[in-house]
Design a protein with these regions (language model features):
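Short active-site neighborhood of thiol/selenol oxidoreductases, capturing the structured segment around
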Residues: 71-101
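Structural microenvironment flanking redox-active thiols in thiol-disulfide oxidoreductases
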Residues: 95-136, 146-150
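Structural micro-motif
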Residues: 137-138, 156-168
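Short acidic-hydrophobic, aromatic-tinged amphipathic segments that line or gate anion-handling sites
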Residues: 139-143
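Thiol-/selenol-based redox modules, centered on thioredoxin-like
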Residues: 162-201
Length: 201
């Protein structure tokens, strides 16, 4: 009876998590819909890869919306890092993707990982865009000037000057373990990122 009760409770918690994710996703989409620029369907990938799994991740220092400067090297030996490049503020998929990471912060914590969100937008634009999302738990960084320099270094700068929708998972030694240069028109599945986080030590 006790085992049955635990199994039932686990099932209920799982259902609540899924429903919460769906509702949150819908509410965020509704909240932004009147302010979102609709670019139409874009070429899925428009960049030349420069890095691969096993490479050392290039260091960078970028300004954050919070006012501080964030360097990748400050996490060396301390944290695993996930870099999330998104193309642009005020676009449909990007406006859903980053708030979704709030739902899995506990998984990042479990695997001693930090998320760094990067776009080529300037700080005022990023502030105006992310403020209505509520409290994002991760640093939001501007790769505005020199324009797209970090995206270029990581091989994810598109020909039109925005970055790809890309994820890089980097271990505490600064080694790239996983790269997903995603179809720019689609949001990467959270489940896939969670699987990669589960491989971290």
């Amino acid at each position: 009876m006790h085992k049955t009760g635990i199994a039932r409770l686990t099932l209920i918690i799982g259902v609540i998590f899924i429903v919460t994710f769906i509702i949150t996703d819908y509410c965020l989409s509704e909240m932004f819909k009147d302010y979102i620029y609709q670019p139409g369907t874009l070429k899925p990938v428009d960049s030349v890869p420069k890095l691969k799994a096993g490479d050392q991740s290039p260091d960078f220092t970028l300004p954050a919306v919070s006012g501080e400067k964030i360097s990748l090297n400050q996490y060396l030996g301390k944290k695993n890092v996930v870099i999330s490049f998104v193309p642009a503020a005020w676009t449909p998929v990007c406006s859903d993707q980053w708030p979704g990471y709030n739902l899995v912060k506990n998984i990042f914590d479990k695997y001693d990982a930090i998320l760094l969100g990067i776009t080529v937008d300037n700080i005022p634009t990023l502030y105006a865009w992310t403020f209505p999302m509520g409290k994002l738990w991760f640093p939001v960084l501007s790769d505005f000037w020199p324009h797209g320099a970090v995206a270029e270094r990581y091989g994810v700068l598109r020909s039109n000057g925005v970055s790809e929708r890309a994820l890089f998972v980097i271990d505490k030694k600064g080694i790239i373990l996983y790269i997903d240069v995603h179809d720019i028109n689609k949001r990467p599945r959270l489940e896939d990122l969670v699987k990669e986080l589960e491989k971290l030590k």
